[in-house]
């Protein structure tokens, strides 16, 4: 008799989820051609032109801030869509909860706006 019969499928899926990446990387290492130590192959490719300067440049933080604000509001849409589809069944309590959620996001948007995260100069 198994110790935890309810979790047999969970453990099977967990084992499969761990084995698939290991197998994929192993097969890739076996099938991939060997890499040579040629310095020409390890240079940065810039449309056939010799690279100028370093390949690592520092990006400004505003790109990341802009992307972060976008992701936050994109995820908000993902959360609001199921609520909107079942609005009739949920009632006034769910409406109040979503209203609080949207107010918190609006406060965050105002904060980001005042900090200058949305300015592009």
Curated annotation (Swiss-Prot):
It catalyses: a plastoquinone + NADH + (n+1) H(+)(in) = a plastoquinol + NAD(+) + n H(+)(out); a plastoquinone + NADPH + (n+1) H(+)(in) = a plastoquinol + NADP(+) + n H(+)(out). Its EC number is 7.1.1.-. The chain crosses the membrane at residues 10-30, 65-85, 90-110. GO terms for biological process: photosynthesis, light reaction. InterPro entries: NAD(P)H_OxRDtase_bac/plastid, NADH_UbQ/plastoQ_OxRdtase_su3, NDAH_ubi_oxred_su3_sf. It is found in: Plastid, Chloroplast thylakoid membrane. It is a multi-pass membrane protein. NDH is composed of at least 16 different subunits, 5 of which are encoded in the nucleus. GO terms for molecular function: NADH dehydrogenase (ubiquinone) activity; quinone binding. HAMAP family: NDH1_NuoA (MF_01394). PANTHER family: NADH-UBIQUINONE OXIDOREDUCTASE CHAIN 3. One of its GO terms (cellular component) is NADH dehydrogenase complex. It comes from the Eukaryota. It comes from Staurastrum punctulatum. Its main location: plastid. Keywords: Chloroplast, Membrane, NAD, NADP, Plastid, Plastoquinone, Quinone, Thylakoid, Translocase, Transmembrane, Transmembrane helix, Transport. The keyword Translocase applies. The gene is ndhC. NDH shuttles electrons from NAD(P)H:plastoquinone, via FMN and iron-sulfur (Fe-S) centers, to quinones in the photosynthetic chain and possibly in a chloroplast respiratory chain. The immediate electron acceptor for the enzyme in this species is believed to be plastoquinone. Couples the redox reaction to proton translocation, and thus conserves the redox energy in a proton gradient. This is NAD(P)H-quinone oxidoreductase subunit 3, chloroplastic. Belongs to the complex I subunit 3 family.
């Amino acid at each position: 008799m198994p110790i935890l019969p309810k979790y047999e499928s969970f453990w099977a899926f967990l084992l499969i989820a761990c084995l698939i990446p290991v197998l994929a990387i192993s097969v890739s290492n076996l099938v991939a051609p060997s890499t040579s130590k040629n310095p020409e192959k390890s240079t940065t490719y810039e449309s056939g032109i010799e690279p100028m300067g370093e390949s690592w440049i520092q990006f400004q933080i505003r790109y990341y801030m802009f992307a972060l604000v976008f992701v936050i509001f994109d995820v908000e849409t993902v959360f609001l869509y199921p609520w909107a589809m079942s609005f009739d069944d949920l009632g006034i309590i769910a409406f109040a909860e979503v209203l609080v959620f949207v107010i918190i996001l609006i406060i965050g948007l105002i904060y980001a706006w005042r900090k200058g995260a949305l300015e592009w100069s």
